[in-house]
Amino acid sequence: MPGIKVREGDAFDEAYRRFKKQTDRNLVVTECRARRFFESKTEKHKKQKISAKKKILKRLYMLRRYESRL
């Protein structure tokens, strides 16, 4: 769980910015959104398949783009 120590003389904005960075790095907000509603195993599996397909297509696109430069 993210937490910061506010140093003496620190402005609120600086401390808040550091806290936001930590929460973003630890994926707290995204995990919270994902757990907000129940997701069955089939839905999770579908999402994983879709993301895997997107990754493959992205790699193919980058590979073809790289090959066209040669």
Curated annotation (Swiss-Prot):
<dbReference type="GO" id="GO:0003735">
    <property type="term" value="F:structural constituent of ribosome"/>
</dbReference>
<dbReference type="GO" id="GO:0006412">
    <property type="term" value="P:translation"/>
</dbReference>
<dbReference type="InterPro" id="IPR001911">
    <property type="entry name" value="Ribosomal_bS21"/>
</dbReference>
<dbReference type="InterPro" id="IPR018278">
    <property type="entry name" value="Ribosomal_bS21_CS"/>
</dbReference>
<dbReference type="InterPro" id="IPR038380">
    <property type="entry name" value="Ribosomal_bS21_sf"/>
</dbReference>
<dbReference type="GO" id="GO:0005840">
    <property type="term" value="C:ribosome"/>
</dbReference>
<dbReference type="Pfam" id="PF01165">
    <property type="entry name" value="Ribosomal_S21"/>
</dbReference>
<keyword id="KW-0689">Ribosomal protein</keyword>
<comment type="similarity">
    <text>Belongs to the bacterial ribosomal protein bS21 family.</text>
</comment>
<dbReference type="GO" id="GO:1990904">
    <property type="term" value="C:ribonucleoprotein complex"/>
</dbReference>
<keyword id="KW-0687">Ribonucleoprotein</keyword>
<protein>
    <recommendedName>
        <fullName>Small ribosomal subunit protein bS21</fullName>
    </recommendedName>
</protein>
